[in-house]
Design a protein with these regions (language model features):
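Transmembrane-helix signature of 12-pass secondary carriers
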Residues: 2-277, 282-285, 291-385
Length: 385
């Protein structure tokens, strides 16, 4: 038995018998291990959105010094391309995960993360960087739509709230990791520096290394080398968690809830048995609840956006959700996330110090998310909100 049709969906007795007779579909995995692997997708979300803050100061440097000689307009597009890709990825990611499964979609996204990261790392010019930042954005958006759903559907009720909060924590942890690696690499190189061979104006002494901050406004300086390649090292480090995500998800089961949505209860039970503790979790009761919920959803039919907006209680939920998302964006946090080193540099800090100080914002965000994770583990999610 591998699947059932909606017309012959098993009843309570059939489900109990199926639970007794169905073996686990593979090796047992703890829910902590599953969450740790799946949230590599969230970590990548955070890393790829945060890493650009430290990379941009190096991209401003001339090509001979390892940079891309970008201007302010191009700097804005580097961030915008990822955001555009993320918007498309979030929509497409949800649809693909509904059709092909959460696990399969995360595996696909891991591959896109690797492709996008390597494409950005080895981009020979700004146009190619735009393209692969857009591709990377698709993976970021897809992860934001798929990973929380996979966690929610895989987690037992007793820890579901905490695991969903863990997703958000790992996003800001990824940003902190990006800021930290940016600071480490920048410090190792001594900050953005160029080698000036000569300067006919006499402003600079030839044959010396100078901070890029000091040289960028001296048009007569002849630059022959620099440490601008540091931005490529910052970006390529994201391949490590992406590979871990791809390898780890190959060891994980598909979402049992997704199997049930396709009336494949045999596979659903087999998948859930891999990640449930028989001493703590009542699988018969859980699968019965899933089947009941699926019947209700089938009876309600498809909920379009128009239908959601026309019903009072769903309209209220929609407005609250959209309002919170808009408020989050209007706070300007994305500006700080992408451009804080530039803002600090404009305030008088050196480029190297600005990249290092950015770690503080990541640490504060991580502490806040950690506190939220603690509250969710102690209180109801609605009360925390």
């Amino acid at each position: 038995m591998t699947s059932t049709s909606s017309a012959t969906r098993p009843n309570q007795k059939d489900l109990e018998k199926l639970v007794d007779e169905t073996p686990a579909s593979g090796p047992k995995r703890s829910i902590a291990f599953l969450a740790g692997v799946a949230t590599f997708g969230s970590l990548l979300f955070g890393y790829d959105t945060g890493v650009i803050a430290g990379a941009l100061p190096y991209m401003y440097m001339p090509r001979i010094a390892g940079g891309l000689r970008i201007n302010e307009f191009q700097e804005g597009l580097v961030g915008a391309c990822l955001a555009l890709g993320a918007a498309i990825g979030a929509i497409a990611g949800g649809r693909l995960s509904d059709h092909y499964g959460r696990r399969h979609n995360i595996l696909l996204l891991a591959g896109i993360f690797i492709l996008g990261t390597l494409g950005c790392t080895f981009a020979p010019n700004i146009a190619v960087l735009y393209l692969f930042r857009f591709i990377l954005g698709i993976a970021v958006g897809g992860a934001s739509a798929t990973v929380p759903v996979y966690l929610a559907e895989s987690a037992p009720t007793r820890v579901r709230g905490s695991l969903i909060a863990l997703d958000q924590f790992m996003i800001v942890a990824g940003q902190l990791l990006a800021y930290s690696m940016n600071a480490i690499l920048s410090s190792a190189h001594g900050g953005p520096q160029v080698y000036v061979t000569e300067d006919p104006s006499g402003t600079l002494t030839g044959g010396q290394w100078y901070p890029w901050d000091q040289v960028q406004n001296v048009s007569s300086a002849v630059i022959t080398a620099g440490d601008g390649m540091a931005w490529r090292w910052m970006l390529v480090l994201a391949t490590i968690p992406a590979i871990c995500l791809w390898l780890g998800m190959r060891l994980m089961p598909e979402s049992g809830r997704w199997y049930a949505s396709k009336d494949r209860y045999y596979e659903a039970i087999g998948a859930l048995k891999r990640i449930r503790d028989p001493k703590l979790d009542n699988l018969s009761e859980e699968i019965a609840q899933i089947a009941e919920l699926q019947q209700r959803e089938d009876a309600q039919g498809h909920w379009s956006l128009r239908r959601t907006a026309s019903v009072a209680w769903t309209r209220r939920l929609l407005l609250i959700g959209v309002g919170l998302a808009c408020f989050d964006q209007l706070t300007g946090i994305n500006t700080a996330m992408y451009y804080l080193p530039k803002i600090l540099a404009a305030a008088g800090f050196s480029a190297a110090d600005s990249i290092t100080l950015n770690v503080i914002t990541g640490a504060v965000a991580c502490a806040g998310a950690g506190f939220g994770l603690y509250l969710v583990s102690k209180l109801a999610r609605r009360h925390v909100g």
